[in-house]
Regions:
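A beta-strand edge to alpha-helix "cap/lid" segment located at domain peripheries
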Residues: 1-5, 61-134
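Short, low-complexity N-terminal intrinsically disordered segments enriched in polar/charged residues
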Residues: 1-31, 131-134
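A structural signal for well-ordered alpha-helical scaffolds and beta->alpha junctions
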Residues: 3, 18, 22, 53-56, ...
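Hydrophobic alpha-helical core bundles mediating ligand binding, dimerization, or RNAP-core interactions
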Residues: 10, 14-17, 29, 37, ...
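Short, mixed-charge, low-aromatic patches
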Residues: 11-20, 43-47, 63-67, 87-89
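Short glycine/serine/threonine-biased micro-segments
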Residues: 18, 50, 96
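A solvent-exposed, acidic/Ser-Thr-rich amphipathic alpha-helical stretch
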Residues: 24, 30-82
């Protein structure tokens, strides 16, 4: 796939996330996708490595049951024929504590046959931990 096609796929995934359309996100990943929000420790239920579409669905279910997104704005995207890197301005409120986290997220996607085969996301884990703690 071309860099432009890969960016288009990521933007459609981001738009699906904004709508809460996990099925559309799952359509964009390979059956054996390797998906992870990288973090030391388990401060948030969505942290850790997931495999396959069921793992990605669990990631979004855990995230959605924990956080209410207030802002998710891609601010920079770079791509080539196999990879996409993005920076996303993010703000969300913990459903349990009412505390808000605001940060930039960093996403790396690797493509295979036009679909996302690998994802790694990083965030301010200390801020996430503080937001989720009661």
């Amino acid at each position: 796939m071309s860099a432009d096609a890969n960016i288009k796929t990521i933007m459609s995934v981001y738009e699906a996330f904004g709508r809460g359309d996990v099925a559309a996100i799952l359509d964009a990943v390979t059956d054996d996708v390797d998906w992870a929000a990288e973090a030391a420790g388990a401060a948030a239920p969505w942290y850790g490595v997931r495999h396959g579409k069921d793992g990605v669905a669990a990631f979004f279910a855990e995230f959605g049951s924990t956080m209410e997104v207030e802002e998710f704005t891609p601010v920079s995207i770079a791509a080539n024929d196999t990879d996409v890197l993005s920076v996303v301005r993010f703000r969300a409120q913990s459903r349990a504590t009412g505390k808000t986290a605001a940060m930039d997220l960093h996403h790396y996607f690797a493509f295979r046959d036009g679909k996302i085969a690998y994802y790694r996301g990083t965030e301010d884990t200390a801020q996430t931990r503080a937001t989720l703690q009661t």
